[in-house]
Design a protein with these regions (language model features):
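Terminal substrate-recognition subdomain of acyl/acetyltransferases
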Residues: 2, 141, 145-158
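Conserved active-site tyrosine of GNAT-family acetyltransferases
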Residues: 128, 133
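Conserved beta-strand-loop-alpha-helix junction that forms the acyl-donor binding cleft
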Residues: 115-125, 141-147
Length: 158
């Protein structure tokens, strides 16, 4: 059983973007969604998006252990988690959960937080449900034919 790893999450430095794009382009769901390296770079630098990386709290070593891409007004004017990725060697250490906690704190003044999960990504769907996100809709054939993007939502205030 892997142990929980404490990380430091901070805004990405300019040299982190290439690493994050390579991580995206070399892993699912982006492989199945036919996203190449250039499309991943473009996603990470989209105007209005904020990229944050996690580094080991003990050593702050390079490269990062993963990233989260946030869009403050990305879904119907509400905050949106655009992407979360954790390097294969760091998966199962609680880093994804720390990214969600970070995003929720970052957007705490808002009532809602949204994200999309690919229909084939069962592991991510379970992960988000465990963290209190609810399935609220489906976009059929949204990115690639044959797969849907599932809309998940978390409400912070009543």
């Amino acid at each position: 059983m892997k142990m929980h790893r404490a990380v430091h999450i901070a805004a990405a430095a300019s040299d982190d973007y290439a690493w994050c794009a390579r991580l995206m382009a070399s892993s699912d769901p982006w492989i199945t969604l036919c996203r190449d390296l250039e499309e991943c770079r473009s996603t990470l630098t989209r105007p209005g998006s904020e990229l944050f990386v996690a580094r080991d709290q003990e050593s702050e070593k390079i490269p990062p252990l993963g990233f989260i891409l946030l869009a403050p007004y990305g879904f119907a004017g509400s905050p949106y988690i655009a992407s979360v990725a954790v390097a294969a060697e760091a998966q199962g250490l609680g880093i994804g959960s720390q990214f969600l906690d970070f995003a929720e704190q970052h957007f705490r003044s808002h009532a809602h937080l949204f994200l999309l999960v690919s229909s084939f990504n069962q592991r991510a769907q379970q992960f988000y449900r465990r963290h209190g996100y609810e399935f609220v809709g489906e976009l059929n054939d949204y990115i690639v034919c044959g797969h849907s993007e599932l809309i998940f939502h978390k409400r912070f205030h009543d």
